[in-house]
C-alpha cells in the first residue's frame, strides 16, 4: 500500500527533530510579575549590495542567510554548537496558490548545527536543504510537530523581504496601519525587514522577561555577526561583538 503524504512528512521531521533537546531561548534577565510587550528596532548599516553579493557567493537566498545567521547567534548565546527555533513562510509552495488571496502563512521549526570546522558555505547549504524540505513537507502541521517533539514557537525568527506601508490601488495609494496586538506573540520574535533596499532589525519581546538593554544587545550582536560572516570562512570564526 502506498504511503500517504502525511506519514512521509512525519518521517522527514523524525529525521531532523526526533530526540533533540536543545533549548535556545535566551535566559531572561528580568522576572516581572505581569506579562508586558516590548519593541525595539535597529537599522542595519550593511549595504544591500554586499548582502546580495554574499548570498550569490554562497548560493543561497537572503532568507537562508539571515535565518542561518540567527541560528549561529542563538547557538553562541547558549554556548552551544546548535540552536533550535521557529520561523514562518508564506505557505505558497504550490504555483496554483500564487494569486490566491487568503492567509497561508505557516510556522516551521528550524534546527541549526555546526562544529569548529564547519564552513559558512556548508552550513548555509545544509540549512537551505532543510528549509526547502520542511516547506515541501508542510502537510505535517506545526501543532503536530510541537506535540510529537516537544517544540514550541517561544523563540521565532522571520525574514520579511521588500515590505511597504503603501499599496497602489488603481490611481490611489492605500496607507497601511499597524494593528499589532498589545501583547507580545511569544517571549522573543526577531525579524529582518527590508524597506527601500535597507535592512531593519526588529524585536518584539516580553518586557517582563527581558530588559531593553538585553534585547538591544542581541540586535547589536546580530549586526556584528553579519559583518563578521562576510569576512570569515568558518562558522566558529564569526564574532558577535
Could you say what each language-model-derived stretch is?
Residues 199-207:
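Short, well-ordered beta-strand elements
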Residues 29, 192, 203:
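Conserved catalytic core of two-component histidine kinases
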Residues 1-10, 37, 55-63, 67, ...:
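His-Asp-centered acyl/peptidyl-transfer active-site segments
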Residues 7-8, 35-53, 121-125, 179-200, ...:
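AMP-binding/adenylate-forming domain of the ANL superfamily
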Residues 1-38:
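Short amphipathic alpha-helices and their capping loops
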Residues 16-23, 134-140, 144-146, 214-241:
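A short N-terminal helical cap/helix-turn-helix that marks the beginning
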Amino acid at each position: 500500500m502506498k504511503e500517504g503524504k502525511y506519514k512521509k512528512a512525519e518521517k522527514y521531521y523524525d529525521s531532523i527533530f526526533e530526540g533533540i533537546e536543545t533549548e535556545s531561548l535566551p535566559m531572561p534577565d528580568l522576572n516581572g510579575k505581569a506579562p508586558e510587550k516590548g519593541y525595539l528596532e535597529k537599522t542595519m548599516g550593511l549595504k544591500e549590495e554586499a548582502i546580495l553579493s554574499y548570498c550569490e557567493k554562497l548560493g543561497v537566498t537572503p532568507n537562508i542567510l539571515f535565518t542561518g545567521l540567527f541560528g549561529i547567534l542563538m547557538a553562541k548565546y547558549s554556548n552551544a554548537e546548535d540552536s533550535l527555533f521557529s520561523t514562518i513562510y508564506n505557505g505558497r509552495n504550490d504555483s496554483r496558490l500564487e494569486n490566491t488571496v487568503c492567509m497561508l502563512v505557516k510556522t516551521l521549526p528550524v534546527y541549526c548545527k555546526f562544529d569548529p570546522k564547519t564552513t559558512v558555505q556548508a552550513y548555509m547549504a545544509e540549512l537551505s536543504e532543510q528549509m526547502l524540505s520542511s516547506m515541501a513537507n508542510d502537510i505535517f502541521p506545526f501543532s503536530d510537530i510541537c506535540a510529537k517533539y516537544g517544540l514550541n514557537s517561544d523563540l521565532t525568527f522571520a525574514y520579511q523581504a521588500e515590505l511597504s506601508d503603501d499599496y497602489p490601488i488603481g490611481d490611489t495609494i492605500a496607507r497601511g496601519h499597524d494593528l499589532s496586538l498589545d501583547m507580545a506573540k511569544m517571549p522573543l520574535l526577531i525579524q529582518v525587514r527590508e524597506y527601500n533596499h535597507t535592512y531593519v532589525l526588529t524585536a518584539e519581546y516580553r518586557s517582563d522577561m527581558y530588559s531593553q538593554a538585553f534585547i538591544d544587545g542581541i540586535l547589536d550582536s546580530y549586526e556584528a555577526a553579519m559583518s563578521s560572516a562576510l569576512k570569515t570562512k568558518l562558522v566558529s570564526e564569526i564574532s558577535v561583538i
